[in-house]
Amino acid sequence: MFTPLITTISLILGPTLHPEIVAAQDQLKSPSEIEKLSYDDAIARVNDILAEENSTNDIRPECHSIMKDHGKKTDKAVVLIHGVSGCPAHFAELADKFYNEGYNVFIPRMPKHGLTDNNRHGEVTLAELASFAEQTTSILSGLGEEAGVAGSSGGSSVATWIAQYGKGTVKKLLLLEPFYATYDKFQNTLVKKVYGWNLLPDILINGNLSLRALGKYLLLVDSYKSDMYAPGVESISVILSEGDKGIDHNEAANVSKKMADSSGAEYQYVELPKSMGLEHGIINPGDPLVIPHKEKLYDMYYKAYTGEKVSALAESNTIEDTETEEEQPSQLSELSLVLEQ
């Protein structure tokens, strides 16, 4: 009974109190024409971003945007997009693998992320996410003849948008632990409709994860095309951990599979087994849970990005066609405790 009530309240108060969020939603659903850039113009845009970041002391040294290029437009290029509360350092080592294979690689820093005060990622606005997605797509268009995107968690949410609205820019799509929804539907509604619309003060869960930021990414997910069509996309690979308690696994599978079917793209969905000890966060090279598996994981991610069929590193579920399963135990346990108070 509470979910319809929350939705009704947000529909009344949200647009009234925050018309800027309505405008950002419109921008995401009907973006301006994505500007296709030459290599020189794309690098100039990146250099502007780097110069702006270098002009402030607010960004942690390891969290500046990263550009690894070969001095020319290459046959292949990739953009790597970090997750909510993360920063480009999470993709730095995987970027080396792509670069050594001849790719131009860009790892942009999400707005309000990677700051010395990491709690400020909760200040990110939906308009900033929209502008970030558009600018990143334009830069990608100039870096390589065949371009693609890989994202982690909320970065996969943005990568999915870029694939759909990038006017054919994206050919390859790698979605690591894509954040399309929290598992519990009530939690998902509350985070999106209340915190996404800034109707309550922000709360940090797990020590440094902003509910307002999570809500903005969920609002971005609402902007996806109803048919999920992603023009030009040739392959979509999804990888997550069975032990991930931060996202809805069914949504991760069903949303991505619908996009692949609608776009005529090759598709694979792989869950890493719980025996690996991985949770939500399967990319950060400094994560103690990732370190023991890092070399094999990164090799898997690279192969999956290229469209090569991969299997998990041990016995696991590898799913080609995933239907919605019966209800599972509630996830985001700390979020549950916060919301019940």
Placement of each model-derived feature along the sequence:
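Short, surface-exposed "cap/lid" segments of acyl-processing enzymes
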Residues: 59-110
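Short alpha-helix in the alpha/beta-hydrolase fold that links the catalytic acid
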Residues: 94, 248-260
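Catalytic nucleophile-loop/oxyanion-hole region of alpha/beta-hydrolase
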Residues: 115-143
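Gly/Ala-rich beta-loop-alpha elbow adjacent to hydrolase catalytic centers
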Residues: 150-155, 159
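Hydrolase active-site cap/lid region
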Residues: 168-215
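Short beta-strand/loop motif that positions the catalytic acidic residue
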Residues: 232, 238-241
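Acidic catalytic loop of the alpha/beta-hydrolase fold
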Residues: 243-247
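Catalytic active-site module of serine/aspartate enzymes centered on a nucleophile-bearing elbow/loop
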Residues: 282-332, 338
